[in-house]
A protein has these predicted regions:
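Flexible, glycine-rich beta-alpha linker
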Residues: 35-37, 59-60, 84-107, 128-129
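Glycine/proline-rich active-site loop of Rossmann-fold NAD(P)-dependent oxidoreductases
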Residues: 40, 66, 91-107, 115-118, ...
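Active-site Tyr-X1-5-Lys
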Residues: 17, 55-89, 108-117
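Conserved Rossmann-fold NAD(P)-dependent oxidoreductase catalytic core, especially the SDR/UDP-sugar
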Residues: 6, 10-59, 84
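Hydrophobic positions on the long internal alpha-helix
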Residues: 11, 15-19, 71-72, 141, ...
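Active-site beta-alpha turn of Rossmann-fold NAD(P)-dependent dehydrogenases/reductases
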Residues: 28-32, 87-89, 126, 159
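Active-site loop of short-chain dehydrogenase/reductase
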Residues: 23-27, 80-82, 117-119, 125, ...
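Short-chain dehydrogenase/reductase
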Residues: 5-9, 53, 57-69, 99-107, ...
Length: 168
């Protein structure tokens, strides 16, 4: 919706601008792999950005995140503002959404197995491929990126590096 895009763009615009105005040494922008085209080959590479159509169910969120990436790259070019952009794969860990019907993949599977009586039912045929990363590993990647990544708003995918099917 228009409100969703507006609010997300305004939030990140204000954060980025205030970080720049207040002398933040390096800004770490967190996005999502939903910024990539719907049919991007997996594992998705950073250079797939804006090469095809987005997934329609996520396009408002993706557009907002892409605008943040582009804004940081422009701030670096114009002002020398240092930033990096991290796109996590499917994050899982404590305090996630464990609801069996609308939770994230791994937490909802845990709930279903825990509550199982005879049979566990999943969505679809289990063939979709996903890459996962634990919250602790993603936090480590964020800290690592402050010192070790480029400063020009470059985009980095963060995940396990291995796609697995849901049924596996």
């Amino acid at each position: 919706s228009a409100e969703f895009i507006y609010e997300n763009i305004m939030i990140q615009t204000n954060l980025i601008n205030e970080a720049y105005l207040n002398g933040v040494k390096k800004f770490v922008f967190l996005g999502s792999v939903c910024i990539y085209p719907k049919f991007a080959p997996t594992p998705v590479k950073e250079d797939s950005l804006m090469t095809d159509h987005l997934e329609p169910t996520n396009d408002a969120y993706a557009v907002a995140k892409i605008s943040g990436i582009k804004m940081l790259q422009a701030y670096h070019k114009q002002y020398g503002f240092k930033s990096t952009c991290l796109m996590p794969s499917n994050i899982y860990g404590p305090n996630d959404n464990f609801h069996p019907e609308n939770g994230h993949v791994i937490p909802s599977m845990i709930t279903k197995f825990n509550n199982q009586t005879e049979e566990v039912t999943f969505w679809g045929d289990g063939s979709p491929m996903r890459e996962f990363i634990h919250t602790d590993d993603f936090a480590d990647a964020c800290i690592f990126s402050v010192d070790k990544s480029s400063d020009n708003g470059e985009l980095y995918n963060v995940g396990s590096g291995e796609n697995v099917s849901i049924k596996d």
